[in-house]
Each structure stands twice: as structure tokens, then as C-alpha cells.
Design a protein with these regions (language model features):
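Catalytic domains that recognize anionic headgroups
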Residues: 1-301
Length: 301
């Protein structure tokens, strides 16, 4: 059997803010068993570079082969030929599910060509609010993060230990369920795009994944403390920086587990052998290697 047999389908998995060295295939100290198994069975690119250090600067190239600001001063792909459009016109089924990144919505043209498209960005019926969400893509995540102590307390009172309240904050289950439903009904050939936000600040991983990557106890108060200091621009000491790294690693492992469930869905529907899986990050994440946290809009090299 060929190592790389002919495939009919493509699943593109993009993870917001995914550092290469957060994956075990690039750094053996990391705990990402599912991603590592993909790497072991496939091709690993050691010198692949994002075309930007921010979602609106990198995704135009990924989904429309257009460098941002190439011919206009705009972000998004409303004036570009989208990959999904080309595939759809060729008779390939297309679906895209984005875990609430406001920069990857129809407002910016990312629905083009997708027969099924869901950005999972909440709408409250206000055009002003909708425009605000489109340019502040993580505001919902910060609201969810601020209420995380209440969710943890509620889970404790209900003796609920499945961590679902934390997993819900990233819309991970929403995109996972949508993708699984698409796979159950899909007729080959198809193109499926899934975008995860778990590794984007604020990092709110479920406690089970914190325990997988760290032996240190990590309560909600420490999670709040670490993000509060960074959010307010205060000095971050080494302890807080290490806590942020731990939360980030746990969030990446959370995505890793979700990818594993999608692979199981491919297997269950008899699609695994004829489906290519592509895994990529849209940009990295900084932990003061160059003086900032998260992904500050700057170039250092």
C-alpha cells in the first residue's frame, strides 16, 4: 500500500495562535499525541512561515492565495477568488466552521464558496454590535473568561466533573459537532475547513488538560490573576509567565483532543483512508521572547 494513497477529500484544520514548538512533532517536551500521530503518518514542514502575525494578515493567503494588501488597503477576501469557490464550482462539497473568530466571517468574505458556513459569532440584532464583533474577534471569549469562576463553582455544586463549562467557552464543541454532522452526511469529494480558537488568548482550558500538561495545582484564581495582569498591561513576573505558558499548552492539548474526535468521525464514516488532513496555525504566540505577550502587531525580524 502506498504511504500516500490518492485521496478524494481534504480536511483543513487551522488553529489560531498555534506555535510550532507547542506541538510534540517540533518539540518532544510537548504533549499533543493526536497532532504527533498526524505528523508521524504524514509530512512535517520544518520551515513553513505564516504570511502575517495576525489572523487578518495570514488568512487571505491561506483561503484565497492572496497576500494581504497586495492590491488594496483592505483585509479580508471580499475582492478575491476564494479557494472554496473554486472547489464548489468544480462539484466538490464545501463546509466551513469557525469557532467565533470575528475576522473569519461573512463580513470579511470568508463565507464565499462554502455551501455550509457557520462562524458561531453571536448576533444580538444590533448592526453596531455586529460591526464591533467583526473588528474585535475575541470579545466573546473575554466575556466567557470573566464568568469562568461562576461556571466552575456551579459545576462543583452540581458535582459535575466533566469540565463541560470550560470546554464550551471556546465554541470548540460547536465546531466539532457541526464538522461531525457534515462528515456523517458528506458525499465525496468534499473540502471541510475547521478553525479552532482555544489557543488564542484568553487561554481557558478545561482543568483536565491542565492536569495533563502540568503537575502543579492551577485554580481559577490563578488563571484570572495571570490574564488580568497581562490584560491591564502590568508587569508580568516569571511565575505569571509560566502560568500563561501552562494554560496555553493545556489549550493546545484541548484542541489536540478535539482533532482526535474528528479523526474518529472520519473512521466511523469510512472516510479516513480517502481523506487528507492538513493542520496549520495562522500565526504564533509570544511569551515575551520579543518584549510582548500574545501576538502584538509588530515584526521583529
Amino acid at each position: 500500500m502506498d504511504r500516500f494513497p490518492d485521496v478524494s477529500n481534504v480536511v483543513l484544520l487551522t488553529v489560531d495562535s498555534l506555535r510550532a514548538d507547542a506541538v510534540g512533532a517540533y518539540d518532544e517536551r510537548r504533549h499533543t499525541p493526536v497532532m504527533d500521530s498526524l505528523a508521524a503518518d504524514g509530512t512535517v514542514f520544518d520551515r513553513a512561515f505564516a504570511t502575517g502575525n495576525w489572523t487578518p494578515f495570514s488568512f487571505p493567503t491561506m483561503l484565497s492565495a492572496r497576500p494581504v494588501f497586495a492590491d488594496t488597503n483592505r483585509i479580508g477576501i471580499t475582492e478575491s477568488r476564494a479557494l472554496a469557490s473554486v472547489l464548489s464550482e468544480a462539484g466538490i462539497a464545501t463546509a466551513g466552521f469557525n469557532a467565533a473568530n470575528g475576522f473569519l466571517t461573512s463580513h470579511w468574505g470568508y463565507d464565499a464558496g462554502f455551501q455550509e458556513f457557520e462562524p458561531f459569532v453571536a448576533s444580538v440584532g444590533s448592526s453596531i454590535y455586529s460591526r464591533y464583533l467583526a473588528t474585535h474577534p475575541t470579545v466573546e471569549a473575554w466575556v466567557q473568561f470573566a464568568t469562568s469562576p461562576l461556571r466552575r463553582a456551579g459545576s462543583w455544586l452540581r458535582r459535575n466533573t466533566d469540565d463541560r463549562p470550560f470546554l464550551d467557552t471556546s465554541r470548540m464543541f460547536d465546531v466539532e459537532h457541526a464538522a461531525t454532522s457534515f462528515l456523517e452526511a458528506a458525499d465525496a469529494p468534499f473540502f471541510l475547513w475547521v478553525h479552532y480558537m482555544d489557543a488564542h488568548t484568553p487561554y481557558v482550558p478545561a482543568p483536565r488538560y491542565i492536569r495533563e500538561v502540568s503537575s502543579n495545582f492551577f485554580g481559577t484564581h490563578r488563571m484570572l490573576h495571570a490574564h488580568l495582569r497581562t490584560g491591564l498591561g502590568w508587569d508580568v513576573d516569571e511565575r505569571t509567565l509560566n502560568e500563561l505558558r501552562t494554560l496555553y499548552a493545556a489549550a493546545v492539548r484541548q484542541v489536540d483532543a478535539s482533532i482526535g474526535r474528528l479523526r474518529e468521525a472520519l473512521e466511523a464514516n469510512g472516510l479516513a483512508e480517502e481523506t487528507a488532513i492538513i493542520l496549520a496555525g495562522d500565526h504564533g504566540e509570544e511569551f515575551q521572547e520579543h518584549g510582548h505577550l500574545a501576538h502584538y502587531p509588530k515584526l521583529y525580524d
